């Protein structure tokens, strides 16, 4: 047996399938039509130029002609211009950069910028490098430092059982070092590499260099030109294996570092056009084709596509005169075939003859799950994913071959407006090249992302042959050839495979044989505002319906007017279904003609029905239809009271990959459904997909979708629940996973439940005190346990500024149509650490269908550090923020300034997740709610029975800090008592806040005011004049006022405090340290420390004016601590200054030593005195404690205080103090990592969009 297996040839043809599409047969017939002369734009995560198979074409040309990042995620602001001194410049990282003498720069001017590597590293690479850096750079050194610190601590503890006061500090020092090292390990965070970037003009072209070694020696780094000039690229190192190229824009002021954002794009390009000269069996479908790599997946958004990236990409596609676009991306859209992005795609296709191929989506098996643009845009060829028996053996190593099938997850049509959705299908899996940074040569991936480039490569073969033979073609003729020659698989439904599996050889023959002008035309089919007839809801199929269908020819761009005039098509219209009636003929000229089609679905059985009305040119009927009118009708099953609103099926047989669809008319009043699946098989476990979709006009299918992939064990049972909309048809689909082996039998039931609330969203205004809502059990007896939970509070922001300007050279559409941006700036305060979700309500949830080009927000802290970003789908971009102030910059782009100006006051919201959820009390009648008595618990509602509930307001002490008028809380209302009902039937709740209650004033202040009233006016004037002079004393650089007031008010403490603050805040502070000490002593001497200590020791104060006394004593203590700390800081600075001057020759060195000893004694005394009154980690004391530790060279204690200072005030200067202490302690690894954080935490400006 083993010998037989090893002798069997390896099925290489199944690794990257070409046989199924006729590509292999075509290349056997025409080996030179292998894609030569064809340029494919791959709009994806970017293509790695160093990946296997991405170097050359079959005729020796560069495989990748250009690599472009249109997202902006790799952009570096290089507007800062410097000139070297002595061959060196200081980069924005702070590193000294050595300019090699071999560089040519006639102007001597360099544009510099900085970029954090983790900003553009792919997520998987970032995670790998973080792990490797910790294991190789951090862990070995840190473990040794921690072991040494523990050893010293242990030795000291053994030698000093009863330490003195001085030894206590040494013990604390050693303990601090151990504590800090442990803390650094817990808080370890890798900033990643930080690269200095240089751009300059060498007299002929722009060049760029990135300091990838991070040591400033630029001779080690690669100098690059724009990739298109010489196909140059560099690599960030042997560990990363991340290849990169550059593009330079705006006269050197902007550098784009282009890397792949993921493995997806390289895999796609390898399928379409990979070429392996030594291993031709590994070739892509069109190895002779060239690639234009355009990165449209924004690394900042986890490679999500953006409007900016897509529109810039289409500009590049047009400018490079591409023949084909492969786009293996897409999202669900609220309305098909519409929006700015789709408009730009349509323009590229119809005006520039660019064939646009895209994935249909991976959201099946339910119908109408095609994504945008692949399955919803008229100009795009949407490709479904097919799996063949050879693929099952070669790629998936299945034990046995199964019949060819569509992947379970491949999206199905029709689109919401009736178009077929899926145009054609192609193999949806491959083992192909991936980027080098993955450390793999190849990888198995599947999806319509893989079927699209397979089809695209096949089309490239066709175009290669047509170009070689000078056969003219249009996007319309190529699409018609593909659809009319595709092979339909009998066991696969039309909505999954479209017109069938593409056949490259037959499509080529079709185009060579059918060269008439009519075949080069496109045809726009419209049914009102739709592109087909789609009858799905019960009301639509209850009676016959007439539909006016418009058919209009679409001419290729630059068609002569004479040809438009001469167009006269004699068309035959056919339908093969008895339930559809249409005219038999149509005369079509250069205008939109309308015909009437009648659809009568009354006699159709329950389920799904599809047919087409096809239009044939009677001059060449064998060429197939010129256009099709797709017609879909769904006849839904009904469930009613007699069946307990259940649909039950027993002992249902499932083969591998088999799908069973059930269309059900959801009963009016139903709000959720429960599905229960039971296995009847005792020997086979089975994988199933449970999928349900309801369509609502102008809502994407995902808005009312349920999806569950489950593994059902032998004789196992599972139950799931999902929300439904009453009165509309729902498709419930249960599908056996495509790769499952053996047959299986199951029972399953779909049961409907209904608890209807009067409002689809509950809006509660706290000002009303009590809010009512009513509930009805619509279908059957239901157990209720109403519960309202609030999980977030929402802050509404208005822009502080709105600035509009034209964008750069990358943002000009054909015919010099300039694009513009508006940047809106918002500020908000985060009251405490927590998770936030920013969003723009007007534009969010809109991407392809949006009328604006794009939206992108970036959030910054007060130091302009980028904290996070997001775009159209806010739920994907939640982030955790610490307490502080933040700025949000929102970019919106459009071609018309007037449309942008309308948004200059656009509101923006920030949703703050509550650390603890809040609940509202619910009562069954108004009186109970008014008195705050018995809350509603559990009750059972009979069918059709109505029950009111009353909600009371949230107590004021529960309102989150920072929330106020204009803010609201969000959460949900659940009504069902069952866990399944709670999970599925959820009603959104908004709770609107009002102003908080006015707090009563402090009684002590009132008493103070009363005592002030008793003073006569002259006394008041004298005191006011005194206080005014004290106020101005601190602003004037003079001692005159102080001396004057000291004579008049020798015992007035605030005067001495003001003098101390005046001296301590002066620019010449270091020259007046002795005066500061004297001023501090004056303050201290005017405080009765004994009386203060006695008061603090009191447990209670029974005196009637206790509040006033407490206030006065608190002020005295605060003043005393402040004076001690300022005195201590002045003494410490004096000693640190002297330490810096050690070694200097001086005649009075002995006198200085005595003075230093005296100052040190005074410092020590002040330190211990301070500890009597407060904790060393008090905010006021931290600076003094830090400086005291420095004087005593106790760097561990110093670093502990310095890190606390950073927490309180995270300035760059405070961080530099920490770094200095880390170096003094010998912890260079900590210092190095912290130094790399500085340019990230304190960038010179906001990052570019």
Swiss-Prot record:
Keywords assigned: Acetylation, Aminopeptidase, Cytoplasm, Hydrolase, Nucleus, Phosphoprotein, Protease, Serine protease
Domain Peptidase S8: residue ranges: 9-508
Enzyme class: hydrolase
Modified residues (Phosphoserine): 915
GO CC, one annotated term: nucleus
Region (Disordered): 998-1017, 1141-1161
Note: The limitation of proteolytic products to tripeptides is achieved by tailoring the size of the substrate-binding cleft: the two negatively charged residues Glu-305 and Glu-331 that are blocking position P4 limit the number of residues that can be accommodated in the binding cleft and thus create a molecular ruler. At the same time, they orient substrates so that the tripeptides are removed exclusively from the N-terminus.
Similarity comment: family membership: Belongs to the peptidase S8 family.
Name by which UniProt lists this protein: Tripeptidyl-peptidase 2
Organism of this sequence: Bos taurus
């Amino acid at each position: 047996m083993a010998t037989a297996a090893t002798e069997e040839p390896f099925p290489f043809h199944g690794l990257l399938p070409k046989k199924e599409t006729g590509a292999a047969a075509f290349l056997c017939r025409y080996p030179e039509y292998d894609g030569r002369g064809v340029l494919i734009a791959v709009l994806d995560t970017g293509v790695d130029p160093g990946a296997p198979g991405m170097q050359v074409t079959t005729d020796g040309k560069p495989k990748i002609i250009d690599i472009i990042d249109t997202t902006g995620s790799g952009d570096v602001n290089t507007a800062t211009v410097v000139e070297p001194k002595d061959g060196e410049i200081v980069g924005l990282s702070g590193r000294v950069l050595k300019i090699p003498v071999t560089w040519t720069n006639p102007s001597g001017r360099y544009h510099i910028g900085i970029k954090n590597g983790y900003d553009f590293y792919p997520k998987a690479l970032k995670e790998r490098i973080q792990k490797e850096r910790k294991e190789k750079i951090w862990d070995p050194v840190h473990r040794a430092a921690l072991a040494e610190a523990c050893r010293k601590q242990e030795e000291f503890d053994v030698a000093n059982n009863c330490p003195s006061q001085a030894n206590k500090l040494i013990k604390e020092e050693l303990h601090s070092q151990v504590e800090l090292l442990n803390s650094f390990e817990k808080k370890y965070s890798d900033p990643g590499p930080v690269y200095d970037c240089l751009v300059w003009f060498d007299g002929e072209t722009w060049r760029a260099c990135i300091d990838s070694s991070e040591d400033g020696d630029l001779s080690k780094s690669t100098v690059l030109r724009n990739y298109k000039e010489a196909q140059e690229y560099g690599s960030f190192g042997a560990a990363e294996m991340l290849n990169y190229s550059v593009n330079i824009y705006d006269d050197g002021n902007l550098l784009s570092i282009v890397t792949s954002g993921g493995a997806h794009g390289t895999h796609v390009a390898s399928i379409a056009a990979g070429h392996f000269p030594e291993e031709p069996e590994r070739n892509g479908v069109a190895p002779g084709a060239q690639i234009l790599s355009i990165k449209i997946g924004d690394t900042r958004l986890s490679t999500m596509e953006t409007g900016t990236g897509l529109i810039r990409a289409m500009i590049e596609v047009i400018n490079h005169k591409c023949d084909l676009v492969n786009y293996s991306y897409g999202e669900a859209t609220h309305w098909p075939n519409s929006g700015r992005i789709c408009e730009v795609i349509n323009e590229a296709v119809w005006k520039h003859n660019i064939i646009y191929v895209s994935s249909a989506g991976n959201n099946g098996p339910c119908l109408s799950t095609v994504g945008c643009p692949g399955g919803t845009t008229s100009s795009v060829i949407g490709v479904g994913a097919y799996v063949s028996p050879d693929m099952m053996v070669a790629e998936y190593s299945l034990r046995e071959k199964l019949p060819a099938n569509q992947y379970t997850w491949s999206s199905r049509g029709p689109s919401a407006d009736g178009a077929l959705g899926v145009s054609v299908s192609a193999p949806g899996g491959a083992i192909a090249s991936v980027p080098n940074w993955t450390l793999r040569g190849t990888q198995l991936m599947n999806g319509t992302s893989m079927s699209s480039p397979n089809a695209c490569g096949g089309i490239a073969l066709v175009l290669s042959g047509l170009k070689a033979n000078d056969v003219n073609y249009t996007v319309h003729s190529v699409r018609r050839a593909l659809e009319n020659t595709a092979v339909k698989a009998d066991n696969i439904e039309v909505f999954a495979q479209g017109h069938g599996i593409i056949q490259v050889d037959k499509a080529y023959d079709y185009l060579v044989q059918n060269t008439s002008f009519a075949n080069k035309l496109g045809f726009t089919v419209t049914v009102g505002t739709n592109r087909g007839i789609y009858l799905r809801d019960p009301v639509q199929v209850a009676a016959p319906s007439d539909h006016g269908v418009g058919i209009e020819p679409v001419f290729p761009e630059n068609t002569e007017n004479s040809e438009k005039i001469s167009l006269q098509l004699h068309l035959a219209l056919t339908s093969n279904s008895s339930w559809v009636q249409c005219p038999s003929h149509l005369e079509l000229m250069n205008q939109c003609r309308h015909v009437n089609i009648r659809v009568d679905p009354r006699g159709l059985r329950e389920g799904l029905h599809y047919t087409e009305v096809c239009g044939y040119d009677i001059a060449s009927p064998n060429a197939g239809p010129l256009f099709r009118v797709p017609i879909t009708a769904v006849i839904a099953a009904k469930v009613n009271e007699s069946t307990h609103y259940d649909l039950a099926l027993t002992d249902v047989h499932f083969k591998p990959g088999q799908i069973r669809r059930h269309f059900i008319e959801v009963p009016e009043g139903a709000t959720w459904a429960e599905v229960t699946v039971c296995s009847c098989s005792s020997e086979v476990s089975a994988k199933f997909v449970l999928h349900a979709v309801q369509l609502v006009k102008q809502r994407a299918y995902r808005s009312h979708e349920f999806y569950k992939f489950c593994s059902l064990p032998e004789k196992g049972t599972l139950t799931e629940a999902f929300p439904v909309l009453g009165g509309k048809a729902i498709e419930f689909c249960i599908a056996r996973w495509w790769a499952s082996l053996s047959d299986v039998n199951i029972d399953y039931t779909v049961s409907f439940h209904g608890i209807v609330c009067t409002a689809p969203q509950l809006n509660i205004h706290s000002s009303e005190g009590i809010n009512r809502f009513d509930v009805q059990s619509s279908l059957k007896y239901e157990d209720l346990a109403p519960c309202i939970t609030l999980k977030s509070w929402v802050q509404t922001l208005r822009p502080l500024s709105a600035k509009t300007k034209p964008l750069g050279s990358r943002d000009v559409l054909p015919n010099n149509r300039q694009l513009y941006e508006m940047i809106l700036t918002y500020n908000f305060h985060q009251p405490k650490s927590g998770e936030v979700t920013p969003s723009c309500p007007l534009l969010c949830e809109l991407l392809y269908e949006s009328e604006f080009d794009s939206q992108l927000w970036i959030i910054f802290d007060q130091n302009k550090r980028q904290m996070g970003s997001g775009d159209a789908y806010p739920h994907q971009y939640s982030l955790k923020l610490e307490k502080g102030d933040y700025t949000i910059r929102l970019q919106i782009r459009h071609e018309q300034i007037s449309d942008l100006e309308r948004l200059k006051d656009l509101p923006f919201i920030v949703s703050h997740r509550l650390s603890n959820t809040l609940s509202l009390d619910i009562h069954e009648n108004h009186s109970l709610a008014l008195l705050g008595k018995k809350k509603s618990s559990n009750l059972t509602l009979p069918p059709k029975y109505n029950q009111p509930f009353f909600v009371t307001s949230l107590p004021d002490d529960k309102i989150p800090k920072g929330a106020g008028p204009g803010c609201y809380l969000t959460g949900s209302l659940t009504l069902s008592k069952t866990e399944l009902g709670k999970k599925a039937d959820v009603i959104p709740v908004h709770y609107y806040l009002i102003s908080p209650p006015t707090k009563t004033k402090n009684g002590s202040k009132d008493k103070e005011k009363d005592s002030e009233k008793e003073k006569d006016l002259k006394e008041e004037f004298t005191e006011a004049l005194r206080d005014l002079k004290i106020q101005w004393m601190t602003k004037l650089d003079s001692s005159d006022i102080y001396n004057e007031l000291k004579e008049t008010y020798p015992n007035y403490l605030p005067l001495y405090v003001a003098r101390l603050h005046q001296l301590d805040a002066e620019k010449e502070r270091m020259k007046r340290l002795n005066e500061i000490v004297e001023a501090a002593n004056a303050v201290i001497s005017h405080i009765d420390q004994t009386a203060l200590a006695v008061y603090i020791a009191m447990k209670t104060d029974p005196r009637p004016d206790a509040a006033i006394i407490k206030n006065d004593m608190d002020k005295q203590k605060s003043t005393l601590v402040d004076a001690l700390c300022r005195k201590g800081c002045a003494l410490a600075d004096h000693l640190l200054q002297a330490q810096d001057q050690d070694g200097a020759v001086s005649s009075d060195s002995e006198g200085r030593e005595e003075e230093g000893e005296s100052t040190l004694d005074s410092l020590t005394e002040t330190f211990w005195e301070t500890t009597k009154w407060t904790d060393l980690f008090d905010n006021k004391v931290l600076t003094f404690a830090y400086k005291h530790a420095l004087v005593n060279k106790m760097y561990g204690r110093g670093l502990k205080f310095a890190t606390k200072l950073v927490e309180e005030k995270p300035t760059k200067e405070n961080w530099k103090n920490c770094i200095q202490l880390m170096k003094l302690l010998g912890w260079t690894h900590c210092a190095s990592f912290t130094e790399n954080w500085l340019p990230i935490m304190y960038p010179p400006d906001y990052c570019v969009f």
